[in-house]
Amino acid sequence: MRRITPLALSLGLASRVAADDGSSGTSGAVWATPHDSYSSSIGVLGCKVNTNRIAYWPNSVDCNNICVSLSYGGRTVYLLRVDQSQGAHDVSYDAWNYLYTGYSATERPTAGGAVAMDYADVDASQCADLLRTDGHKLPLSAANSMNFLASCLAQPDSWVAKNYVLYNILDSTCSWGHDEVCTIDWPAANQPTCPSTLGDPANLTSAPVYNIRYPSGQTVVASSGQVVPAQDDAKDESAAWLGMAPNLVGLVLAMTFSILGTNIHS
């Protein structure tokens, strides 16, 4: 389960209000808050996914509903649900910043709190581009994801049961282990087989995970905190947004500010 950060403590109350308003359904509104440190309670490997598009929400992660859309100001992103919060509707800082401003957090970082955004549970295929594995399968830790995977394999028609891949990497920030694929002969065996020893805590440096710090927008290596240049993942959607026809951008912005003005004066 994701640890509570000072940011989550200060902003979590508003998100819990959304959770009490029926956000466990298939669509609705949530108070989205920014989160700047990748984690996964089910062992999804950050070096194999786009960590700038992750949802950290109160509901437990299940074997089917792992993808949600989040929309604000005419913009929409798809987010992987691979971790569980303790009440807040946190999303990756870059996703929050892009939805709120139209810019990546590495380009124009913005500080702020809970923002009302529209969400919907969507088919997992909508998050395929966020999975950096062959066949867009969910990358799981062979050593530390078996409880979750076993629960999904017990549901053979579930999305995860049909779309997973195991790696001999121990932690979600890919600091320990071997970057190699493992297999499991389920249900005959309950332990994966890997080319190297399963769970070997070798120092892994070839597959770093990056975080974007709140509110500075600096990109850092998750395992060490070392500041590095911004990665391409954080720029793609904001570039697409800015590439829209100027009149369309203007129309969307005008509508957004009109709605904000109405809310302020009502």
Roles of regions detected by a PLM:
Residues 2-3, 12-60, 64-66, 77, ...:
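Mature exported/compartmentalized surface modules and terminal targeting/interaction regions
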